[in-house]
Amino acid sequence: MNMLGRMGGFRSSARAPLVASGAAGAPPSPRTDSHQGKTVIHPDSRSIALVDIVKDYHTQIGVKRVLDGISMDIQPGEKIAVLGRNGAGKSTLVKIIGGVEPPTSGTVHRGLFMSWPIAFAGGFEAGMSGIDNIRFIARIYGMPLQETVEIVDDFAELGRHLLLPVKTYSSGMRARLAFALTLAIDFECFLIDEVISVGDQRFHRKCHDALFVKRKHCAMILVSHDLNIIRSYCDKALILKAGYGRVFDDLDFALDIYQTL
């Protein structure tokens, strides 16, 4: 029997209620009680918490369930890897956590100031220039306009392309712009669906240092096939398989299981 068999498979815990704290003082952080199979969320707690997330897609051949009852929590400064083979639902989960897509059912509690998925360029207005997109996002987040433009310009290294409509950008240029704009805002939790891989090795190192060194105090939800990055920076892992998920606090054990999938 392989490790998956010994761990009892990946079916998630039982249906979990959303419960608010009535006790005085600061509420405890949300945790999954493995004995009772319930996740309790205190809505004002400083954490990110998922309760029984389900995601269905309607196809020509019927309903396809991509995620089935996913529950987990991330505390301030904590870094969790999301592992699974291609098609396991990793990117879908990140989009749900970030609010890019709604779940079919379940609850996402966002008690930390959280980024959109890093390098996700789907939120740009294609007909606007790069600079106008930066200014627009800066206004939404209450950031100083000129300072934000300068930070993004310096990091993204797009030069005069920032004056052109985003629809003229390559996918790599859009990713650079989105990555740099994400770093210009003081998020407490970063959603990372694969570390940016455009540009040369110097730019890769620049992205790595900006995210994992300068922002090592931040919480992160990291999807990556680079096990070295996961070993270096993550505290625990969520493994997805066939729509189900399970969180492992022992990262080395989680990586051993992942490599048997």
Positions of predicted regions on the chain:
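Conserved beta-strand-loop-alpha-helix hinge in the C-terminal portion
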Residues: 244-261
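A short, flexible loop at the N-terminus of ABC-type nucleotide-binding domains that lies
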Residues: 33, 37-50, 54-73, 79-81
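Helical segment within the ABC ATPase nucleotide-binding domain
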Residues: 204-216
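ABC-family P-loop ATPase nucleotide-binding domains
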Residues: 60, 113, 118-201, 209
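Conserved H-loop
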Residues: 217-223, 226-232
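ABC ATPase nucleotide-binding domain signature region
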Residues: 79-81, 85-139
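Conserved catalytic segment of ABC-fold P-loop ATPases
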Residues: 232-239
